[in-house]
C-alpha cells in the first residue's frame, strides 16, 4: 500500500490474525502441564515446542511460493483453518500422542499464518508506517500470549483442566476466518519475478538477508526457550509451585506487550537499527539478572526486563528486511518464517544443557542468542 490513507476496516481483521498467531505461545505454559500430566523428563518435555516449530523450517518457503500464486488472504485462511483443527484435538482426546499431533497442526497452521500475516499487513498500511504497525501488530499478538497462561492456570485451578483455553482459542480462530473472508483486500504488491524455491534460496547469497534470517532464528529460539522454561527457572531456582511459576509466563508476556506498544510509538522517531541494539542490550541485562537473582521477586523483575528488551526484536528484523526489498516480500517472508525453526531447536538444546549442567547453563544459551544480534549493524548488503 503506497497511499498514506489507513483503512481501519481492513486493518482490524488483519490484526485479528495476529491474535491467532499468538496462540502458538500456549506451547509454553502447556509444556509445564503436559510434563506434569505424563511425567516427562526435561529433555523430552522440550520436544513439545520442537513439534510446533520444526514446521516453520519445513513449510515456510513452499508456503511463500504458493502464496505468490494464490494470494496472501487465501493463504491466511488456509493457515487459520489448520490452526483451528489443531486446537480442537487435545480437547477431544487427550494423550501424549494426540498432544503431539495437535501441536504439529498448530505449528503448521501457525507457519502459514506467519508467512501470510506480515505481507498481508503490508497491503493495508503504507511502507513508511510498516515498522510501527508491525510492532503494534506484535503488541496485539502479545495480548494473546499474556492471557493464555492466565486462562490456562485459571482453568486448571477452577475446573481441573487447563485445556479449556484451547476451546477459547478455537472460537476466536473461527471468528478470524469469518471476518477475514468477508473483508475485501486488494493485493497490489506483486513479485518482480515469479517466486520459486531457487529464487528464495538465492536471496541467501545477500549477506544482509542471511544475517536477518539467522537473527530471526536466534530471536525466536530465545523467545520460545524463555517462554517454555520460565516455570522451570522459578521452580528450580526459587522453589515455586507449578501454578505459581506459571504466572511468571504472564509477567514475561506483560513485558512483551508493553514493549511492543511503546515500540510502536518510539519507532515513529527512532532508527530501527539503533532500537534493535538498545533493546538487545536490555534483554541481555535481564538474563544476567535472572542468573544472579537471590529471591523469586528479583527473578520475576528480571523476567520482566527480558520481555521489555525482547519485545520488538522480531518485528524490527522483519520490517528491516521487508522494507529493504518490498517486491520480494513473499520470498523474504518465507525465509524469515523458516528461521522460526529456532523455536524448535533452541529449547531442546536448553533442555539437554539443563539436564547435564543445571538450569544456569540453559540461561547462558539464551544470552548467546541475544549476543549475536549485537553484530547486525556491522553487516552490509551485497545487493
Language-model regions: role of each:
Residues 50-64, 250-262:
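Central cavity-lining transmembrane alpha-helices of secondary-active solute carriers
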Residues 112-125, 311-326:
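Intracellular juxtamembrane helix-capping segments at the cytosolic ends
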Residues 27-28, 206-250:
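Extracytoplasmic gate region of multi-pass secondary transporters
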Residues 58-97:
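Conserved MFS/SLC helix-loop-helix module at the cytosolic interface between two early adjacent transmembrane helices
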Residues 9-40, 118, 226-231:
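Extracytoplasmic
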Residues 39, 71, 92-97, 293-294, ...:
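Helix-breaking motifs and short loop linkers at transmembrane-helix boundaries and internal kinks
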Residues 133-185:
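Helix-loop-helix hairpin linking two adjacent transmembrane segments in secondary transporters
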Residues 102-139:
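Cytoplasmic helix-loop-helix junction between adjacent transmembrane helices
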